UniProtKB/Swiss-Prot annotation:
Pfam families: ACCA (PF03255). It comes from Rhizobium leguminosarum bv. trifolii (strain WSM2304). The gene is accA. This is Acetyl-coenzyme A carboxylase carboxyl transferase subunit alpha. It catalyses: N(6)-carboxybiotinyl-L-lysyl-[protein] + acetyl-CoA = N(6)-biotinyl-L-lysyl-[protein] + malonyl-CoA. Pathway: Lipid metabolism; malonyl-CoA biosynthesis; malonyl-CoA from acetyl-CoA: step 1/1. It is an enzyme of class 2 (transferase).
Length: 317
């Protein structure tokens, strides 16, 4: 069953009519609904084009959070072969919000790290809705250290509203863990490619996203805080999230123009949730091109370029 966003009502109405006509044709074979269904399908496509060609930042935020949008586990199943997950931080516990491990990407050994939100009540609770605790970031550090030791390129897939802000997480050193993970990303002497596949929220995202190349899916978002959080702080009114989203410059187009990201990966018509296989394949192509481009560079070059990239970003914004 498709989950429709509020602004997709014209699409849901048309697709609802198509479902009704198909059901009618099934119940009574003497009724031919083929032509009408064809006309409605054309109108559906036109409605999707019209709506998705002029999404505002708040609508893009909703698309980035769509429950049927492909998550890390979907990319891992399709993009990688022999994915072997790593568990635990060897200090406190396991954190399923961060998924990390070794894999093959188009025949090449790589290290993989990303956030997983889950797609139903059970898995969302298991993965803490994609909000990592300190042990998750320390697990990410483990895989980054391993990648650096064995010369494995790192691929990170970012999808989090932010690091978990609970008391226990703070007591166990959340800020330190995020800082160490960011430092490790900046310090490895291997290629590091990061892709924001949904939400890129605050330091919780940056901790695994300081790559040589950083990309965003067309309808993903990347920001220092959620629009609701910004509205609550600025105006003490979370209902002004739409206004905050516009002012914060959180879309892929905004961040590309500001020089924060290196490129935008186009999504299928209607968003990644309408054709997950297509967007996952496109993401794989972009990652492969980025790794190929960096293949001849030395470890020192890669590290220095990455550090300089983010230093320049801080100076120029």
């Amino acid at each position: 069953m498709h989950n429709y966003l509020d602004f997709e009502k014209p699409i849901s109405d048309l697709e609802g009519k198509i479902i009704e006509l198909k059901k009618l044709a099934t119940e009574d074979e003497s009724i031919d609904t083929t032509d009408e269904i064809g006309r409605l399908e054309v109108r559906v496509r036109e409605a999707i084009v019209e709506i998705y060609s002029k999404l505002n930042p708040w609508q893009k935020t909703q698309v980035a959070r769509h429950p049927q949008r492909p998550h890390f586990v979907d990319y891992a199943k399709t993009l990688f072969q022999e994915f072997t997950p790593l568990a635990g931080d060897r200090k406190f516990s396991e954190d399923a919000a961060i998924q990390a491990g070794l894999a093959r990407f188009r025949g090449q050994p790589v290290a993989v790290v990303g956030q997983e939100k889950g797609n139903d009540t059970k898995t969302r609770l298991k993965h803490n809705f994609g909000s990592p605790r300190p042990e998750g970031y320390r697990k990410a550090i483990r895989i980054l250290e391993m990648a650096d030791r064995f010369g494995l390129p790192v691929i990170s897939l970012v999808d989090t509203a932010g690091a978990y802000p609970g008391v226990g997480a703070e007591e166990r050193g959340q800020a330190e863990a995020i800082a160490r993970s960011t430092e490790m990303c900046l310090g490895v002497k291997v290629p590091l490619v990061s892709v924001v596949i949904g939400e890129g929220g605050s330091g919780g995202a940056i901790a695994i996203a300081t790559g040589n190349k950083v990309y965003m899916l067309e309808h993903s978002i990347y920001s220092v805080i959620s629009p609701e959080g910004a509205a609550s702080i600025l105006w003490r009114d979370s209902t002004r999230a739409r206004e905050a989203a516009t002012n914060m410059k959180i879309t892929a187009e905004d961040l590309k123009s500001l020089g924060v990201i290196d490129g935008i990966i186009s999504e299928p018509l209607g968003g990644a949730h309408r054709d997950p296989d297509s967007v996952i394949a496109a993401t794989g192509d972009v990652i492969a091109n980025a790794l190929g481009e960096m293949a001849s560079r030395s470890g020192e070059q890669l590290r220095n370029e990455r550090r300089q990239k983010f230093l320049n970003m801080g100076r120029n914004l």
